[in-house]
Amino acid sequence: MCGIVGANSTRNVTNILIEGLKKLEYRGYDSAGLAIIDDKNNIDICKEVGKVIELEKSVHNLANFKGDIGIAHTRWATHGKPSKNNSHPHASESFCIVHNGVIENFAELKKVLINDGYKFKSDTDTEVIAHLLQKEWRDNFSIVDNIKYIMAMLKGAYAVAIISQKFSDKIVAVRSGSPLVIGVGIDENFISSDALSLLPVTNKFSYLDEGDIAIISKDNVEVFDNNGAAKNLEVEEYNYSSSSASKDGYKHYMLKEIYEQPEAVSNTILASLADGEISLDSFDKRAKELFEKTKHICIVACGTSYNAGMTAKYWIEKYAKVPCSVEIASEIRYRDNVVVDGSLFVSISQSGETADTLESLRKSKKQNYVGSMCICNVPNSSLVRESDIAFMTKAGVEIGVASTKAFTTQLVALAIFTLVIAKLKNSLTDQQIAKYTEELKNIRALVMGALKLDTEIDQISEYFSDKEHTIFLGRGLYYPIAIEGALKLKEISYIHAEAYPSGELKHGPLALVDKNMPIVAVVPNDELLDKTLSNLQEVHARGGKLILFVDKAVKERVNFDNSIVLELDAGHDFSAPVVFTIPLQLLSYHVAIIKGTDVDQPRNLAKSVTVE
């Protein structure tokens, strides 16, 4: 969602801040701004509604807008509409701040501040923090003691970066529920909500823990815990290059990331193998003990990651013979849920910073789970650091808001997890494990084959040019894949799309079917084929337009006139959900192009949802 960048250097930081904001554009935003302390100790602010490029133009048009310390922000509106006044940074007399998150008690605090004579220029919760700093700051207190005292007045989840004339050579940052990472350089140091934004200036990072306070000087970074005790700065090198965030000649990040999936899924599989076999070491040394205790699996996630979890439920129960439930994080977080004896808490998140998923994990630690595992794409993210064990996917940097390669690598990770559990529980023989492992190894080739449908899918996307509604159908293991296909289409083309289990057509959705309703379905080679074809016949009989992605092994069984049928080699249970996902992603992409939408940054959506 919102993005923070801060820099404290011996050089002018204006361009560093702007370039950092550009790297954060993928997170979603509606306005941007930055603030610097100039050589006369003045705080100068520039803000614009719209894209970062507009902010860059405004800054370059200002004479002498430069300084060696500053903070910047991309805003995704939560309190107050998108406007210059509501854009960050926000300032009081001596303090200037940028903020991610939500201050839940801002209305009460604002009322008190107004009664005390403080004037507000915006409708945001953020400006409350700036005035609260001004009101409550005590010059005879240390920076840490002041921050502890003032931040204790705030309720909610937030990350804050502060510059001030009271400490004009420092940036102060606070993490309470929203992620922050320190970037370490030579005679310069940085703060950001995402390491990706700082890759052009450093590859050395330290992630703040919950409750941490950081004081960032040019030549030093001090970190304190929520009790005010000093901590060691643990710095790690980040192995992504800044080119990871480029389009590499593709028109959109999403298309690039769709085409990166053969490598992404292959890398995820290869990382789990030792001597050609799936290894427990790809999880953690503690995994064997934890998995042996597991009698039930509770998967918790949001959005696309939830759909991956739904797919895994079918695998886990069919092959590992372990009962599995799948929960939406924003629901289980607030529900008085009953924990099954021997239940393992499994969270899934691409970023590892999804607010509801993270808070659900924290809640689980107070409950009777045997332990926690996460599946994540970002090393050192909060979810990874706070889970007992982690399986890291190898998707690489994903910029497009609509997840593609993160989803397919999550599926692969969950397939590997299923086979590991099945082996430990003796639910499958060694021969069966070896067979399914070979199937996973073959996914790369199958995904590459599915990508060859791109031209045909581009051609059929024209059919959707005047459509406003679509139904997706899938059965059994492929129902979650239909849900994911519908989610992709609605996310980036703004077509209203819903997914249903094929067997549920008679229970309501069939009423929507007519000659103007596109019906997208996947037809795998599985034990439910006859049932699936029967359901599709019901749609066909009522004039619905069928767009079918069919496993070539059953192509001859599919005979519906006036329908669009594309065939592919999908493989079997462990590969087919991944492979069928590819044409659904391509369909969504090409329909969005036809509709003229912003594919990489669809309206109202953010890549990393770090607030509720």
Swiss-Prot record:
PROSITE patterns assigned to the protein according to its UniProt record, in alphabetical order: GATASE_TYPE_2 (PS51278), SIS (PS51464)
CDD domains in UniProt: GFAT, SIS_GlmS_GlmD_1, SIS_GlmS_GlmD_2
Main location: cytoplasm
Gene3D superfamilies documented for this protein: Glucose-6-phosphate isomerase like protein, domain 1, Glutamine Phosphoribosylpyrophosphate, subunit 1, domain 1
Active-site residues from the entry: C2 (nucleophile), K607 (for fru-6p isomerization activity)
Example of a GO cellular component annotation carried by this entry: cytosol
InterPro entries: GATase_2_dom (IPR017932), GFAT (IPR005855), GFAT_N (IPR047084), GlmS/AgaS_SIS (IPR035466), GlmS/FrlB_SIS (IPR035490), Ntn_hydrolases_N (IPR029055), SIS_dom (IPR001347), SIS_dom_sf (IPR046348)
Xref: SUPFAM superfamilies: N-terminal nucleophile aminohydrolases (Ntn hydrolases) (SSF56235), SIS domain (SSF53697)
Domain Glutamine amidotransferase type-2: 2-219
Intrachain disulfide bonds: none
Keywords for this protein: Aminotransferase, Cytoplasm, Glutamine amidotransferase, Repeat, Transferase
Subcellular location(s) of the protein: Cytoplasm
GO biological process: carbohydrate metabolic process; fructose 6-phosphate metabolic process; protein N-linked glycosylation; UDP-N-acetylglucosamine metabolic process
Catalytic activity reported: D-fructose 6-phosphate + L-glutamine = D-glucosamine 6-phosphate + L-glutamate
Pfam families: GATase_6, SIS
Enzyme class at the top of the EC tree: transferase
Enzyme Commission number, as recorded: 2.6.1.16
Domain of life: Bacteria
Quaternary structure annotation from Swiss-Prot or TrEMBL: Homodimer.
The name this protein goes by in its record: Glutamine--fructose-6-phosphate aminotransferase [isomerizing]
Annotated source species: Francisella tularensis subsp. tularensis (strain SCHU S4 / Schu 4)
